[in-house]
Amino acid sequence: MSIGREEEVEIHNPPRFMPGERVCATRHIKNDGTYPGKEIGERLVRKGDAGFVRDVGTFLQQFYIYAVEWIDRGIVVGMRTRELRSLGGTSTPKTTECARGVNEGKAR
């Protein structure tokens, strides 16, 4: 009997986002207790916020974790692939630009 995984192993493929890439949050992110100086449950990132990928790491030898700098908030938060979408080469973040596509099907 084999044990199935709930989600595919992301690290078998290259990362979807690279350092320096502009990204947008596809959902609200709250502190799960791993972000220092903030209360558990406190909102760290809002859906539609724009930021830049600073680094790419892995978690549980299964998922990519992207260290994203949220310029407007002045914080860096670890994000999963499904919580982000690329803003490509756009020069300045706009709320409407970030929000576009957030509720259109599944997050990347």
From Swiss-Prot:
The gene is nifZ. InterPro entries: Nitrogenase_MoFe_mat_NifZ (IPR007415). The keyword Transport does not apply. Residues 86-108 are annotated as: Disordered. One of its GO terms (biological process) is nitrogen fixation. It comes from the Bacteria. This is Putative NifZ protein. Belongs to the NifZ family.
